[in-house]
Amino acid sequence: MSKQSQHVLIALPHPLLHLVSLGLVSFIFTLFSLELSQFGTQLAPLWFPTSIMMVAFYRHAGRMWPGIALSCSLGNIAASILLFSTSSLNMTWTTINIVEAVVGAVLLRKLLPWYNPLQNLADWLRLALGSAIVPPLLGGVLVVLLTPGDDPLRAFLIWVLSESIGALALVPLGLLFKPHYLLRHRNPRLLFESLLTLAITLTLSWLSMLYLPWPFTFIIVLLMWSAVRLPRMEAFLIFLTTVMMVSLMMAADPSLLATPRTYLMSHMPWLPFLLILLPANIMTMVMYAFRAERKHISESETHFRNAMEYSAIGMALVGTEGQWLQTNKALCQFLGYSQEELRGLTFQQLTWPEDLNKDLQQVEKLISGEINTYSMEKRYYNRNGDVVWALLAVSLVRHTDGTPLYFIAQIEDINELKRTEQVNQQLMERITLANEAGGIGIWEWELKPNIFSWDKRMFELYEIPPHIKPNWQVWYECVLPEDRQHAEKVIRDSLQSRSPFKLEFRITVKDGIRHIRALANRVLNKEGEVERLLGINMDMTEVKQLNEALFQEKERLHITLDSIGEAVVCIDMAMKITFMNPVAEKMSGWTQEEALGVPLLTVLHITFGDNGPLMENIYSADTSRSAIEQDVVLHCRSGGSYDVHYSITPLSTLDGSNIGSVLVIQDVTESRKMLRQLSYSASHDALTHLANRASFEKQLRILLQTVNSTHQRHALVFIDLDRFKAVNDSAGHAAGDALLRELASLMLSMLRSSDVLARLGGDEFGLLLPDCNVESARFIATRIISAVNDYHFIWEGRVHRVGASAGITLIDDNNHQAAEVMSQADIACYASKNGGRGRVTVYEPQQAAAHSERAAMSLDEQWRMIKENQLMMLAHGVASPRIPEARNLWLISLKLWSCEGEIIDEQTFRRSFSDPALSHALDRRVFHEFFQQAAKAVASKGISISLPLSVAGLSSATLVNDLLEQLENSPLPPRLLHLIIPAEAILDHAESVQKLRLAGCRIVLSQVGRDLQIFNSLKANMADYLLLDGELCANVQGNLMDEMLITIIQGHAQRLGMKTIAGPVVLPLVMDTLSGIGVDLIYGEVIADAQPLDLLVNSSYFAIN
């Protein structure tokens, strides 16, 4: 029996109440059965109590069986006393009933699968054997032996038949019933069909018993119709109800079966032929559907065989014992055997002995369910006895009951790859020996997979044990903190400029500080991007010590030489120039001879901005800002200008006296140019080069702020393309992108210079028309819509047509709230699309009312969803992008069901709340269900769970206290409970957050994205994780702005000692990009599919956390 089948299906919180309910059910069915016994036999002709006990034993753990037997027996005895006298009680019969129930339950557990006991006809035959044949026969024998009577054969037959009929009528229903089956009848169609079928079956069965000959033949036809029409559960319920009604009619009037219906037979003598044909026709159609399904399965198997046979890599079906069941041509060519020869061998016989044990360990994990698939590099013997390398990928096919059937193996030839690796290794050994003789360490950095490779000398230089895997963090921690920023900048600049670099820095070693000189060159890929860096490290400590001695003798020379790549100007105490290097001469336009003795600000024409005021005091620059952010411009005397950043260093004598200063000026023109490009990317759509939503909303806010002062009227237009998705689906995304660019140019050509056109997302556009009335706005919008409707887009020789709809709202003194005008334009646009597309609609108040009626969810329905409807907790696995298999943290999202059965996600549901109490109530239910149903299992698995906590819940001291009380009373360690809190709420509710952290909970700040102002107030002890906004991560692999923002957030997180979480991540390329940035954790489909929390904790295996 599988582990799953060993779990107890039912575990009620009140067992005593459940036993009482069983006793009451047994009492009712016993009363019914005993009523039937009053028309002719001492034994009941139809007996249900034994079947009730049998089902109860089957569905409950063995420790509850005594209680079940006692409660059901008391129900039987009570029914007997109610109908008969106390003296008529026969405890022997009750004991026999218990023996039959125990035997039947044991047999059913052995013969049937646990989760779905009745899957096919074979299962039903095993059910009949275990409940309707063996137990009744055993009971009949015991009755004859223990209570002998005048006619033992009659007693035996009545007992066996009554028990068998009761078992076949009740046991299937009892085995199939599950509480969630009742939820299916929320579907009105299924409920109506079930009730109608029940009513028709009972009515026609009643009429058959009263007026038709051979009534049971008619009833058989009716029950077959019910079986074909309805699902199993409903069909077995109708069978039980029909049996009870017919038996009750027979008990009330035994003469029903003896009365011939001569009148009907005289008028319809051929009626039996109809009864012969109906079941045959029904079964013919059922078998036809079954054969069609078998044909479909056969076709699928044929497709699989063809795909396997003609695959370019080796594929095989392998038995659970290792025998080759089926192989394709590629595998046969790789191993040198024919298919017939491989069938006589096992993979163990062909595997290199050193790889066999590792392979078998993975096979055991696969069979036990610990893993779903595995891959490894392994060696095989081919027919000639040679060892060949292969990349093996294996998955397991299981039977519906979970039994392993066979393995699917993919075996790819990597022999040439291994030979190349061996050649490269030998070459590397020769290079290493040569460099060891010269004391030079060689390193390589592959950028995309982020892999570092060091030779032996590198480990010796950094005094790092050879078993430690080198990476950026290992190297970065070795660098002296004072040199880290400069080193990182040099490397980043080299990568951006795709040029070699030379870098000198210091590292910390056991004996103190070691000076390192690094030289590196880049290797470009086919696209011209840097693929990897190759470089050397040299120990320059002795040279540096000598240089330090020379620099101490002449500090001015030290500073000048150290800054030789930048403009260097020396001044005396009177601010007059005493030295200028060539770079300074070039940037200022003055030669050193001309500048000597001239005041500094006469030579250096520095302004704040390109056309800003002159700098009057060289010490007035904002040193708190970075080099790029300081908007300082140096104007050359001969023309031209430079964006610069400068620093001033005082010059001192040996006794500390100040003798002047050294001014170092850096040319940051390119850096500021990049910053401007990033600023442009942040405010413009990358595809159409129109303003994006953020820029559009900013322009709208500026326009709204001037309405009261200028008393002008403006127009806001929303434009939505029609049939764009059809072009995108039929011609491809490239065509869709080209169409958007062409339409953007078309619309832009029809606007004034002061108008603002923006792409809001997808196929939606926004248009701001300053100083424009409704009539003019309607005219402009109509022109645009007509132009779009008439536009012919040609792609790959085909003409595509799209349309557009527009909604207009007027902005004036009485209507200048951003959210309202955006909503009005959206509602007007919706009215245009709803009115037939290709239209222009001006907003009217009644449109908003109609839109609200369609979209709003009533408050009562929201409360009912929170309090009564089903709630599902979905778990999303979180792991490091560098080790995606290691998951020990799970983010929880919520799915709710509306009263119509529609699934609504948590964020959409919360956005519809008009009362903060709804968020508070939803939080309370989430925590209650988690601690009641999942906390114990989560604690036993040792995994960390992150639950959402809204701002309303966080602001409630009562809810926070209740949460901590539930946590204290549960077996869950507080460190395993993570709470997801919106980032903007952390400062306003710092006291509640600190209270949760002191209790041991971990805090996850969500919605961390484009607003970086929060980091000005965020402290290191406020939270543990930063959950990045999902939109920020979606296209990070192709969006430089998003990549820069995530890099900034990652830097802040490292500074604060927090970890970053990004997602959802769907593409491996996005995972690689986030890994390269240094993001700590990610979630999404590349890590694991989301699954219900109860399934996660009940069916998964975890390491000890």
UniProtKB/Swiss-Prot annotation:
Keyword NADP set for record: no
Pfam families: EAL, GGDEF, MASE1, PAS_3, PAS_4, PAS_9
Active site annotation, chain numbering: 763
CDD domains in the cross-refs: GGDEF, PAS
Residues at the site labelled Transition state stabilizer: 725
Topology within the bilayer: Multi-pass membrane protein
Cofactor section: Mg(2+)
Keywords: Cell inner membrane, Cell membrane, GTP-binding, Magnesium, Membrane, Metal-binding, Nucleotide-binding, Repeat, Transferase, Transmembrane, Transmembrane helix
Residue numbers binding Mg(2+): 720, 763
Record-annotated membrane-spanning stretches: 9-29, 38-58, 64-84, 88-108, 127-147, 156-176, 190-207, 211-228, 236-256, 270-290
GO biological process, one term: regulation of single-species biofilm formation on inanimate substrate
Chain positions recorded as substrate binding sites: 728, 733, 737, 783
Annotated metabolic or biological route of this protein: Purine metabolism; 3',5'-cyclic di-GMP biosynthesis
Annotated PAS domain residues: 300-370, 553-623
SUPFAM superfamilies the UniProt entry points to: EAL domain-like, Nucleotide cyclase, PYP-like sensor domain (PAS domain)
Domain (EAL): residue spans on this chain: 855-1104
KO phenotype (gene knockout): Decreased biofilm formation, decreased expression of DgcC, a probable diguanylate cyclase and of the curli regulator CsgD. Disruption leads to decreaseded expression of adhesive curli fimbriae genes. Also partially suppresses the reduced motility of a pdeH disruption; concomitant disruption of dosC, dgcE, dgcQ and dgcN completely restores motility, suggesting these 4 genes, together with the c-di-GMP phosphodiesterase PdeH, form a network that regulates cell motility by altering levels of c-di-GMP.
Role of this protein: Catalyzes the synthesis of cyclic-di-GMP (c-di-GMP) via the condensation of 2 GTP molecules. Involved in the control of the switch from cell motility to adhesion via regulation of cellular levels of c-di-GMP. Part of a signaling cascade that regulates curli biosynthesis. The cascade is composed of two c-di-GMP control modules, in which c-di-GMP controlled by the DgcE/PdeH pair (module I) regulates the activity of the DgcM/PdeR pair (module II), which in turn regulates activity of the transcription factor MlrA and expression of the master biofilm regulator csgD.
Record-given protein name: Probable diguanylate cyclase DgcE
Organism: Escherichia coli (strain K12)
Gene name in the database record: dgcE
